[in-house]
């Protein structure tokens, strides 16, 4: 059986990931491809419990190293118990965020050591990597405007614009480091134009 493809989608808050995830799932379904939709942090029973801790406003003062370690603990469980088994079955996996988010949010946003994140990545992922990463890019001001109407913001969404500018800069830097895998998508365009950019990438897989 042919191994499935692993697609990740990432970007700052308000980039429009949820809308494009719906499109990707619909597009692949029309191609008779079975898609396992998942997310990080989360994706497993244990991962979802860790996600709740990470996003709760009650843990707003969590130490940055603790945050990073919890994310990679959830990621280890996610990869080994959900992602790899699905790929081995021949399913495609679409994950809302993956390791690039750790470099952007914990590395760029929090200012944690990139070398430390890389060590955790090597330990948990080894040589495992997405086939393609769709990086939705929007100016932070536009992203914040898009999420302004959300009734309740989580612990991360409550961060400052300066934080998210650092996150965005880190994402763009990652896309330049890994241009073959990370496809930078201008998500400030219209929904139709953004979707078309993604469609072209999917057709090449």
UniProtKB/Swiss-Prot annotation:
Top class in the EC scheme: transferase
EC code: 2.7.4.9
GO biological-process terms attached to the record: dTDP biosynthetic process; dTTP biosynthetic process; dUDP biosynthetic process
CDD domains: TMPK (cd01672)
GO cellular component: cytosol
NCBIfam families, per database record: DTMP_kinase
Record's function text: Phosphorylation of dTMP to form dTDP in both de novo and salvage pathways of dTTP synthesis.
Protein known as: Thymidylate kinase
Organism: Vesicomyosocius okutanii subsp. Calyptogena okutanii (strain HA)
Biological classification of the source: Bacteria, Pseudomonadati, Pseudomonadota, Gammaproteobacteria, Candidatus Pseudothioglobaceae
